[in-house]
C-alpha cells in the first residue's frame, strides 16, 4: 500500500516497530525493515558508542530504511543525537521531551523526524516544531504513558482533526484489526511495541516473552504516576508499588523501589518480582 507514511519513510507497509529500550536492537530493527516496515533501534538504554555499533550492524544487515528512537530526557540524549546525525540515520523518532531542540538539526543531517505525543496540545506543538509526522500514543501502551490517560480510540481522531502532517497511531495495537481501526480513526500508520518485543529477534528474555503472551485483560495496570505513568503487569511487584503509592510514598522512594529490576527481568527473568508490559520502562 502507499500513503503519506510509506512515502515519507520509503517503506512498503505503514507499520513501525517501536524503539523499546532493552528490546529493540539492530536485529529486530533490521528484521522489521526487511519485511517492509520501519524498524527502530531503542537508544534509551545504550551508550553512544553502543548505539553507533547497532546502527552500523543494522545498516549492514538490511538495505532498507530504519530508524532510532531517542527519549529526549535520557542522560545521553545529546551524545546520542550526535551519533544519529553523524551516521545519517534515515528516521529518528523522539519522545519524552520537546522536539523543537533537535528537529532542525536532524533535518539538516538528512533525517526524517517523528515525535511521540499523548495529547492534541503536544501534537500541535510538534507540528509547529517542524516534525515530519506525529505518533499519537494512547495510554493502553506498554511502558511509559502520558499523564493525560487518554485512550487511543479517543486520542487519534482528536489529533487527526488538529494537525495536517502524517499521523501514526500507537497504544494497544497488535493485529491487522487494530491497524484497520486506527486507519478508520484517521491514522496513516501504526506503531507497535509489545507485539515486536515478544518476537524472536527481540532482546527480551524468553521467560518474559512467555509471560506476556499469556496475559489477559486486566493483567496490566497503570502505576507510578508520581514519576511517570507506567503500565505494569499485575503481579507481586505491582502490588508492592501499589502499596507504596497508597501510603503516600515519595517519588524518590518509588525510584528506589524500582532500582534496576526491570532490566534484570527483561534480560534474565525475576518474573515474580517485577515486570512491565512490553517491559517496565520501555518507550513503545
Enumerate the language-model features and the residues they cover:
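Active-site metal-binding loops of divalent metal-dependent hydrolases
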Residues: 20, 172-173
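Cytosolic juxtamembrane amphipathic/interface segments immediately preceding
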Residues: 251-259
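Juxtamembrane boundary at the C-terminal end of a transmembrane helix
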Residues: 275-284
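Divalent metal-coordination and catalytic microenvironments
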Residues: 264
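Conserved active-site-proximal phosphate/metal-binding subdomains
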Residues: 146-168, 174-252
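Active-site entrance/lid segments in N-terminal catalytic domains of soluble metabolic enzymes
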Residues: 1-162
Amino acid at each position: 500500500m502507499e500513503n503519506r507514511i510509506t512515502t515519507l519513510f520509503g517503506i512498503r507497509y505503514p507499520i513501525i516497530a517501536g524503539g523499546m529500550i532493552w528490546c529493540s536492537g539492530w536485529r529486530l530493527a533490521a528484521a522489521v525493515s526487511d519485511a517492509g516496515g520501519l524498524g527502530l533501534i531503542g537508544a534509551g538504554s545504550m551508550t553512544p558508542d553502543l548505539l553507533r555499533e547497532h546502527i552500523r550492524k543494522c545498516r549492514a544487515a538490511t538495505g532498507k530504511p530504519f530508524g532510532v528512537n531517542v527519549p529526549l530526557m535520557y542522560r545521553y540524549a545529546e551524545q546520542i543525537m550526535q551519533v544519529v546525525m553523524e551516521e545519517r540515520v534515515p528516521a529518528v523518532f523522539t519522545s519524552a521531551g520537546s522536539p523543537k531542540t533537535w528537529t532542525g538539526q536532524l533535518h539538516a543531517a538528512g533525517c526524517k523526524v517523528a515525535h511521540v505525543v499523548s495529547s492534541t496540545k503536544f501534537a500541535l506543538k510538534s507540528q509547529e516544531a517542524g516534525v515530519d509526522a506525529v505518533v499519537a500514543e494512547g495510554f493502553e501502551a506498554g511502558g511509559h504513558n502520558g499523564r493525560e490517560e487518554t485512550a487511543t480510540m479517543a486520542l487519534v481522531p482528536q489529533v487527526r482533526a488538529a494537525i495536517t502532517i502524517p499521523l501514526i497511531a500507537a497504544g494497544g495495537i497488535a493485529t491487522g484489526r487494530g491497524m484497520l481501526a486506527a486507519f478508520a480513526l484517521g491514522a496513516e500508520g501504526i506503531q507497535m511495541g509489545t507485539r515486536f518485543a515478544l518476537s524472536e529477534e527481540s532482546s527480551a528474555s524468553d521467560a518474559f516473552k512467555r509471560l506476556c503472551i499469556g496475559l489477559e485483560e486486566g493483567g496490566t495496570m497503570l502505576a507510578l504516576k508520581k514519576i511517570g505513568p507506567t503500565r505494569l503487569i499485575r503481579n507481586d511487584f505491582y502490588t508492592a508499588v501499589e502499596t507504596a503509592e497508597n501510603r503516600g510514598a515519595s517519588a524518590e522512594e518509588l525510584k528506589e523501589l524500582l532500582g534496576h529490576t526491570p532490566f534484570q527481568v527483561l534480560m534474565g527473568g525475576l518474573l515474580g518480582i517485577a515486570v512491565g508490559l512490553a517491559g517496565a520502562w520501555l518507550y513503545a
